[in-house]
Amino acid sequence: MGLFDMFKGDTEEMTPHFALAASLLFMMGADGEYDNEEVGQLLSVLGGEDNGSGSIGVGANNKALLDRAVKYVRKNTVDAFLAEAAPILTDAQKLCILVNAIDSSLSDGQAEKEEQVMLGKMLTAFGISEERFKPFFEVIVLKNDRSVFTNKNHPKNKDGYEVKLEVSKV
């Protein structure tokens, strides 16, 4: 521990709500850029309000949460975060984070390689297999595939095509 490390620490403990905010920031920044769609998705999860200047910012109730999460993400690695967060989360909270993380990743139309790696780290840290997560993933992929509206030749727009969800028995 260096002399000044005491000033770097996050004095508040990890909470599930904080883990949600931090996980979304880690996912958003995985590819080195914060896309507008990802910011919009973050605001939809954390809540937003008009700040009076014509732009929407994080609502007052969650501004402190987001500010704290931004500071945390700047100072900590995703591996350190996952080691700290995983033990305090319930199964439902882990899945909520994973679904929101993949939604953020796909909000701009595709999951970059770095975002795919990030999701893999989250799945592993949370003890959720790809097989178990697959149905959730498929729903979010469908939700974000807006090309079904703009491409009449999209394979899912063919006569007789029916969306099906495969649910594993894990």
Regions found by a protein language model. Give the residues of each.
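Small-residue-enriched hydrophobic alpha-helices in membranes
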Residues: 1-29, 33-170
